[in-house]
Amino acid sequence: MTRETKKLFKVKRKITPLTVLVPLLLVVLLVCAVIYDNSRIVLDEVTFSMPTLPRDMDGYTILHISDIRERLFGAEGEALDETLGDSEYDIVVMTGDLVSLAGDDTGLCQALDYFAAKQVPVYFITGEGDPPTTEIRQDGSFGATAWAQNALDRGAVFLDVPIALNEGERKLWLMPASTLVLDTESSIASLDARLLDENLDDGTVQSILYRKGRYEAFADAMAQRQQNDLTIMLTHMPCLDASLQSESTTAIFSEADLILAGHHLGGQICLPVLGALYAENDLLPRGGWFPDDRYMTGLNEVNATYQYVSTGLGTMYGAPLNFRLCNPPQISLITLTRQVDA
């Protein structure tokens, strides 16, 4: 075919206003959907059956919040009020990554002010993105860091030892997973040995005494736990099948009747039908690409242990990826019941 013949059969594509407007409209709709999704907070309501739950705790409700990061709720907690409405809950638990990547705790303080006004107790653990909770200051003194002190001043409790949520023959314990790897006896002995050093400054001595006190409190709480007690365990990082297969970790997490976790933000970027695109975790198959939903969101059974994973409120990346796609910010209302068929 000659060049002249090709020219005869060449179809000229005419650019019309419609061919420009349709893709542009789709982009605008997508942007609007993303903005809407990121501006709201959805409430995931879950019922978890614990047949041996003490009768006086039947219906006990936990508000689970995770990964606040850069999320703001308004000076009066308006965003929380809009989502929760008239919902009732007995306690609030927060499972880490509570301050922004820049170390800003404004969102956390707004949330704590809101719950303090409602006189609801709040317990929190930290995530890998949170600054330390204690420090030796420049003047040599030891104490809470600024963000942790802000939380404590608002009535929140840093959960570094198990706490019984009720009295009675069978207790329901709230327990931080991080402390279960401790060998308290050897840890206390090691700290006692360090205290023999006469060259320690006052801040270091106070830091050691604080840690020793927490280890002793942990040992006391564990000694009070009975075999038939129930345990809700808080962990920032969700437990995976792989992480539950060693004898040590299986022994740790078998203590829990229910694990509450966060961290992955549901993948942050999700695709319709396919789910989460990627999650940062070296233990996940495929290097974290298209991770199993059991580790991303909701109530699932992981190696014979029930675990609820919140998709959280914030984002794991800075600009321009500080948005969520097909995955709106979430808080969760978990009701415990004695009913087996709940």
Residues covered by each model-derived region:
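Acidic/histidine-rich helix-loop elements
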Residues: I35-D37, I62-E78, L98-T106, P131-F142, ...
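A short C-terminal boundary segment appended to hydrolase-like catalytic domains
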Residues: R3-R13, T19, T311-A342
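N-terminal membrane-anchoring alpha-helices
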Residues: M1-D56
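Membrane-embedded segments
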Residues: Y60-V157
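Active-site neighborhood of phospho(di)ester-bond hydrolases with catalytic His/Asp-centered motifs
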Residues: L63-S66, I91-D97, P121-E128, L159-V161, ...
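Beta-strand-turn-beta hairpins that frame and shape the catalytic cleft
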Residues: S49-L63, A156, P162-P176, V181, ...
